[in-house]
Amino acid sequence: MQQAKAIARYVRISPRKVRQVVDLIRGKNVSDALAILQFTPKGATEPVTKVLQSAVANAEHNYEMDTDALIVKEIYVDEGPTLKRIKPRAMGRADQIRKRTSHITVVVVEKKEG
């Protein structure tokens, strides 16, 4: 069974926030997944949609799969490097701000007939 894959690396959004969105579309038909993402009011939907569309394009152009029969086999989020910043506080103190990044991976496969 052939599968197409797409990865978005160093996306500047927390992995926890992206996982909330990713959990909604795991195992779904690609067209259903895109519809769910379109109507989900979260900031993470934009990068997830972009990666999913990239995986579909890879399936179509590299493996000549039927885009109507694609399902989201795997979708997961890994933690990328964290950017550390400092926020000045009162009395000469400073707090550390962690700007987290994510790596989003999507694998799509063609659904078998029958």
Swiss-Prot record:
InterPro entries for this protein: Ribosomal_uL22, Ribosomal_uL22_bac/chlpt-type, Ribosomal_uL22_bac/org-type, Ribosomal_uL22_CS, Ribosomal_uL22_sf
Ribonucleoprotein among keywords: yes
GO molecular function: rRNA binding; structural constituent of ribosome
Superkingdom of the organism of origin: Bacteria
GO BP term, pick one: translation
Keyword line: Ribonucleoprotein, Ribosomal protein, RNA-binding, rRNA-binding
A Pfam entry, by short name: Ribosomal_L22
Record bears the keyword Transmembrane helix: no
Gene Ontology cellular-component terms listed: cytosolic large ribosomal subunit
Family, similarity comment: Belongs to the universal ribosomal protein uL22 family.
Function field: This protein binds specifically to 23S rRNA; its binding is stimulated by other ribosomal proteins, e.g. L4, L17, and L20. It is important during the early stages of 50S assembly. It makes multiple contacts with different domains of the 23S rRNA in the assembled 50S subunit and ribosome. The globular domain of the protein is located near the polypeptide exit tunnel on the outside of the subunit, while an extended beta-hairpin is found that lines the wall of the exit tunnel in the center of the 70S ribosome.
Subunit structure: Part of the 50S ribosomal subunit.
Protein's UniProt name: Large ribosomal subunit protein uL22
Organism in which the protein naturally occurs: Desulfitobacterium hafniense (strain Y51)
